[in-house]
């Protein structure tokens, strides 16, 4: 189909882009000579951990299996170069005073500026992703975050995420420069919408309680939204909006 051909063309472009990054850009960005094979391994490991809170130590362990002699400072140097090239772009944690600071996770969520780079780095195809819905879910999250950043940039939009050690999470918190913010979950399939909506309502309730107790200066979230891979937009009776990813630009 036309859509499949367009996806394959995008992936071909992304693969060529990765070759350029590994063979030249990663060294020319700051004049430090870097190993193309190591760069490729780092990109692949980062892509495998996309949309997760994987620690750098885990990525180093993963890369070390095939890159003998790579150290933590070397990995940092490569990752800094990839950030400067706008290839990888991590997401910071949102740490509001609604739970004890020790309960809220504060590590960075691993991300790419464009999900097609992650797909190409792992050597995956659209057909493979249709079979591996778990990986597709992580890629879908990266795609939705990219779109949210683009469409909210005129409003000073910034994104973070919320995740605590009790496993309550919002995949994305979108903050606008006027103080408004939205709690967002990303769910590929319709069966997961309920779980996503409950997470958002629970976080909203925590914010409400913290306001009542006078322990936060936060306002309540202005929007609760589950972004899906479906085609129908609607508002649930509890106020959570279900929005297909294709409707975001509207």
Q: What kind of region is each of these model predictions?
A:
Residues 120, 193-194, 233-237:
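Switch/connector loops and helix/strand junctions flanking conserved nucleotide-binding motifs
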Residues 114-116, 163, 187, 228-230, ...:
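Residues at the C-termini of beta-strands that transition into short coil/loop
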Residues 128-132, 196-203:
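Short, surface-exposed loop/helix-turn segments at secondary-structure junctions
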Residues 111, 160, 182-184, 225-227, ...:
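Hydrophobic/aromatic beta-strand patches that form the interior of the parallel beta-sheet core
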Residues 2-180:
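Accessory nucleic acid-recognition modules appended to NTPase machines
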Residues 181-192, 199:
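Active-site ExK catalytic segment of metal-dependent nucleases
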Residues 222-250:
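Domain-level recognition of nuclease-like catalytic cores that cleave nucleotide substrates
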Residues 205-223:
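Short mixed-charge
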């Amino acid at each position: 189909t036309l859509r499949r051909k367009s996806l394959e063309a995008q992936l071909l472009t992304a693969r060529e882009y990765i070759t350029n990054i590994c063979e030249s850009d990663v060294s020319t960005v700051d004049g430090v000579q870097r190993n193309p094979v190591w760069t490729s391994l780092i990109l692949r490991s980062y892509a495998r951990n996309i949309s997760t809170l994987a620690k750098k130590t885990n990525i180093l362990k993963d890369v070390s299996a095939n890159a003998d002699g790579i150290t933590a400072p070397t990995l940092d140097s490569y990752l800094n170069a990839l950030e400067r090239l706008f290839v990888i772009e991590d997401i910071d944690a949102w740490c509001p005073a609604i739970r004890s600071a020790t309960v809220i996770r504060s590590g960075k969520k691993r991300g790419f500026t464009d999900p097609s780079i992650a797909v190409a780095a792992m050597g995956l195809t659209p057909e493979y992703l249709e079979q591996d819905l778990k990986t597709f879910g992580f890629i879908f999250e990266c795609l939705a975050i990219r779109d949210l950043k683009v469409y909210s940039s005129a409003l000073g939009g910034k994104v973070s995420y919320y995740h605590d050690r009790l496993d309550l999470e919002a995949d994305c918190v979108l903050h606008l420069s006027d103080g408004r913010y939205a709690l967002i979950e990303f769910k590929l399939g319709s069966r997961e919408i309920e779980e996503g909506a409950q997470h958002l309502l629970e976080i909203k309730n925590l914010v409400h309680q913290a306001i009542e107790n006078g322990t936060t200066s936060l306002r309540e979230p202005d929007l609760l939204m589950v972004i899906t891979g479906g085609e129908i937009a609607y508002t649930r009776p509890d106020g959570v909006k279900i929005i297909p990813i294709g409707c975001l630009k509207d």
